[in-house]
Amino acid sequence: MSLNTDDSGRIRTRQRAKRACETCKLRKRKCDGHEPCTYCLRYEYQCTFKPHPRRKPAASKSSARPSEEEDSPKFLDRVDANQEHMEANSGTAFPHLLGMRLNPQGAPKVYGFSWNLGPRDEPLEPFTNLTDLISREEMEDLASHYLKKIHPVYAVLDPDTLRQKIVARWHDPATAASYDPILCSVAALGSLYSGHQEHPKEGALVQSAKEMLETTRISKTTLLHHATAWILRTIYLRSTNCPHASWMASCSTMHIIEAIGAHQDPELVSLVYSDTADVSVNDESQRRLFWVATVLNSWISYEYGRSRVILRGVSCKPPLPRTGDFTTDLISMYQISERLDPDQNNKLSDLEDALSRVERLTLSHDALILSQSNLALTIYRRLRVASSNISNDILTRIIRLGNDGLEAAVRLAEDRSPWWHVANIPFQFLCILLAIDTRESLSYVGPALRSFRAITRHYSTPTLHTALETIESLVRLSQNKKERDLTLLRDSMQQEDPGLTEQGSTTSQAFNDASWLGATGDLTLPDNFDWDWNVFLDTQVPFFDEGEAGGQRYR
C-alpha cells in the first residue's frame, strides 16, 4: 500500500473510493467518488451513482473471460497513460482541458480553433448517382454475389442492414446518401466475383466510390460508413490492381479507422478523437472494422515490402465468432503472422513455433487456406535467412501446406473466384520447390506446373501467361544446371578409370532417362552459374494486369 503525507506532515494511507459512478464503471476508469466525479467533469459525461448491490460469491477461475488480459489493471493503466500522453501532445484538446478547469459548464469543445487562418471554400464536384448506373434488381443480384463470396471472409457488413439500405436507396433514388460508397463498392465486388462476365458498369461503380471516398479524407465529419467503404475499396484493388494502389488504399483505411476512434474500445476512447469519433458505432461492428483493416494493411505491407500503419493507444478487443463468417479465423491467422514483422528479431525456434501454430489452424474456406499456405511459404523464406540448415521435417511440413494452398487455388479457379492468391500461391510454391531442391520437393514440380497451367486456362490474362512462362523458364534453368552437374560426374568417372567407360556410359544413360529430369531446355548456362532464388521468392504475382482502371479482366 502506498503512503502519502498530508499538509501537517503526517503519514496517511491512500484511500480507495468507496463508490464509483456508472460512467467510470462502464469505461473502466478510476473514479474519485465525488458527485460529479473529476473524470465526468473533464469529459462532459453525465455522472450518476447507483446503490451497491449485495456482494456475490467470487466467480471461479475457470469462468474468466478470454479477454482477461485486456481487462487487467496493468493493461488499463498502460492504455490510460498512453492516452494522457497523447492528450498532452494535442494542442486542439488543451483549450477544452483548460476550460474544464476554469468553467466546467462552459468549456469549449475539442476543435482546431487556431489550426490555420481559415479553410478555403472548395467546390463540390457532383457525384454520379448510383441509381443512374444500375437498377435495384441489378444491385440486389450483385449484392448476393458479394455476400456469397466476400462476406464469409471479410464480414464487415451486416447482411440485413445491407438489404435494408438497398431498399431505402431505391425508394428515394434522387437523394444521395452517406451509404452510397458502400453500395457502389459492394456492387463492384459482386461483379468481380460473380463468376460471369463483368457488369458493364463495374468501372463506373469503382470510379464513383473512389470520388466519394476521396472527399472523406478532407471532410469535417467521418462516419463508420466511410471506414467500411475504404475496406471494400482495398479488397477490390488488392484483387485487381498493382501493389502500390492497394497499399495506399489500406493506409488510408487505417487513418479513417483512427479518425472515428475505432481502434479504441468505447469505454477507453480518448478525448483527442471527440471531434471526429462516430458515437453511433456498434461495438462489435467497430471491432470487426478495426481488425479487418489491420489485417489488410499489415499483410499488404509485408508482401509489398512497405511500412504498415501503426496506431497508438490501441485497446480494441478482437471480435466474437459469428455464425456464417470466418472473420475470426482470419484474425487468428493474422495474430500468428505478427511474429513475421520485419522489426521482430526472430530466432529459429520462434519461426518453427509460428509454423506449428499455422499448422494447427483448422480452416474450411479456400480463401483462408490460401492465406494459410502463403503464411507458411513466408515462414520458409524467413527460415532461409535465419539458418542455412533447415531440417527435413520442417521442409516436409512447408511442402504439405504449400500443396494444400495449391489445391485450394485450383478449386477457387474452377469456381471463378478471383482471390489474389489464386495466382500467387502456385507461382511462389513452385519457386520454393525449386529452391528446396530435394527429391521430395522436385517430385511436386510436375503436378504444381499442371495446376498452374489449368489456372491460366481459367483466367487467360497476359500477366498469368507471363508468370507461367517465367516459372517454366526457371524449371528449365534448374534442369540444365542438374544436367551439367551430371555431365561433370560422368566425366569424372570416365577420367578415373578408362576401362569403365562403357559401364559409365550405361549409368549416365539411365540417369538421362530418369523422369525427374524432364526434357532438355533450350537455355545455356555458364559453368559457374548459381541462381539467386531470393529474387523470385520475394516476387509477388498480381492476379490481373496492372492498370489505371483496375487491371485487365479474365477472359
Curated annotation (Swiss-Prot):
DNA-binding region range list? 21-47
Location relative to the cell: Nucleus
How is this protein used? Kojic acid can be used for several biotechnological applications, including use as an antibiotic, as an additive to prevent browning of food materials, and as an antioxidant. Kojic acid is also interesting as an inhibitor of tyrosinase. Finally, kojic acid has also been shown to have strong nematicidal activity.
Q: Which GO terms describe its cellular component?
A: nucleus
List the Gene Ontology MF annotations in alphabetical order: DNA binding; DNA-binding transcription factor activity, RNA polymerase II-specific; zinc ion binding
Q: What happens when the gene is disrupted?
A: Impairs the production of kojic acid.
- KW Zinc (keyword) present: yes
Tell me what this protein is called.
Answer: Transcription factor kojR
Native organism is: Aspergillus flavus (strain ATCC 200026 / FGSC A1120 / IAM 13836 / NRRL 3357 / JCM 12722 / SRRC 167)
